[in-house]
C-alpha cells in the first residue's frame, strides 16, 4: 500500500478497520442472544481486502 492514497481508498480502509473488531460484551449479555463472536473478523495476513 502506497503512502499516497486517494481519499476514496482511505475511506474504504477506514471502514474496514472499524468493521474489524470484536462484538461488545453487553451485546452478548442481552436476553435471547445467539451471537457469540464477530464471524466477519479479518486478519491482515490471512485474508486480503482485494484492493
UniProtKB/Swiss-Prot annotation:
GO cellular component: cytosolic large ribosomal subunit
InterPro entries per UniProt: Ribosomal_eL39 (IPR000077), Ribosomal_eL39_dom_sf (IPR023626)
SS bond list: none
GO-annotated molecular function: structural constituent of ribosome
Pfam families, per database record: Ribosomal_L39
GO biological process: translation
Alphabetical UniProt keywords: Ribonucleoprotein, Ribosomal protein
PANTHER family for this protein: RIBOSOMAL PROTEIN EL39-LIKE 5-RELATED (PTHR19970:SF36), RIBOSOMAL PROTEIN L39E (PTHR19970)
UniProt protein name: Putative ribosomal protein eL39-like 5
Annotated source species: Homo sapiens
Amino acid at each position: 500500500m502506497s503512502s499516497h492514497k486517494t481519499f476514496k481508498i482511505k475511506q474504504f480502509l477506514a471502514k474496514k478497520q472499524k468493521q474489524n473488531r470484536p462484538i461488545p460484551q453487553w451485546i452478548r449479555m442481552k436476553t435471547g442472544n445467539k451471537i457469540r463472536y464477530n464471524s466477519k473478523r479479518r486478519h491482515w495476513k490471512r485474508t486480503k481486502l482485494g484492493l
